[in-house]
């Protein structure tokens, strides 16, 4: 999903810094954007590392002059029952999905303040809004944490011109959902819970992220944008 966001932003004229622990994949997307006439740089980014976040923000400022938008997109998933979930499994998901968003937000705010404001878009999930029996407790908890962290950020920094909003995708065709989509029974179960009857596409989420990052959303902060094919309307 992050690649779709980066490509769309670049198409709209944004200068992008892409961060990921998957260096080959990240560099390939940055190179693709550059080859098409866009401006992009890649930095290795472990979202659980304060040092990596400091490096990423510094690169954005040094390379492009300022930081105006942060999209916290990194995430990992899991499927388990409460009693089968180990503390290590809980920590792994919470560290990436929740702590990673906190660290990214914390690192970006000073640069956005210097730039005169900015927009933070945090990717949560429809499972950060409603419960379900087909995921893990740590995944839902982490995505719920992202939702409320976003609201606190929005309230604390509204007067400084820094907006923060969360995006709540339903099941999307991405590498993270590939294994579950490949299992026929699981795929059919998930599809049955989507009123539109299909998985979403990464580009459909990317356009929502673009809106929240843009000046067209200048009066939008502390809000949730749900892109889930109707899952949470039930």
Annotate each predicted stretch with a short phrase:
Residues 1-17:
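Canonical Rossmann dinucleotide-binding motif of NAD(H)/NADP(H)-dependent dehydrogenases/reductases
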Residues 81-82, 89-91, 190:
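Substrate-binding pocket helix/loop in short-chain dehydrogenase/reductase
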Residues 105, 142, 150:
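Active-site helix of classical SDR
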Residues 110, 155-156, 218:
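Alpha-helical segment proximal to the catalytic Tyr-Lys
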Residues 125:
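Residue(s) in the substrate-gating loop at a strand-loop-helix junction
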Residues 130, 208-210, 221-234:
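Short C-terminal tail/terminal secondary-structure segment
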Residues 158, 163, 220-222:
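Short, small/polar-rich loop/turn modules that mediate ligand/substrate recognition or access, typified
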């Amino acid at each position: 999903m992050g690649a779709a966001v980066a490509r769309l932003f670049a198409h709209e004229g944004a200068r992008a810094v892409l961060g990921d622990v998957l260096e080959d994949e990240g560099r390939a997307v940055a190179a693709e954007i550059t080859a098409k006439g866009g401006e992009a740089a890649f930095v290795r980014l472990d979202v659980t590392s304060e040092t990596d976040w400091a490096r990423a923000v510094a690169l954005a400022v040094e390379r492009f002059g300022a930081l105006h938008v942060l999209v916290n997109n990194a995430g990992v998933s899991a499927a388990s029952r409460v009693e089968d979930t180990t503390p290590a499994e809980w920590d792994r998901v919470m560290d990436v999905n929740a702590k990673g968003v906190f660290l990214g937000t914390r690192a970006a705010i000073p640069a956005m303040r210097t730039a005169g404001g900015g927009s933070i878009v945090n990717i949560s999930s429809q499972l950060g809004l409603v419960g379900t029996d087909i995921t893990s407790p740590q995944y839902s908890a982490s995505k719920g944490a992202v939702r409320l962290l976003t609201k606190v950020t929005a309230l604390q920094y509204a007067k400084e011109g820094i907006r923060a909003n969360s995006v709540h995708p339903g099941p999307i065709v991405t590498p993270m959902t590939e294994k579950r989509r490949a299992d026929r029974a699981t795929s059919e179960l998930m599809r049955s819970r989507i009123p539109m009857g299909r998985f979403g596409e990464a580009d459909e989420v990317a356009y929502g992220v673009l809106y929240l990052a843009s000046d067209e959303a200048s009066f939008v902060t502390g809000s949730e944008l749900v892109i889930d094919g109707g899952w949470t309307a039930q």
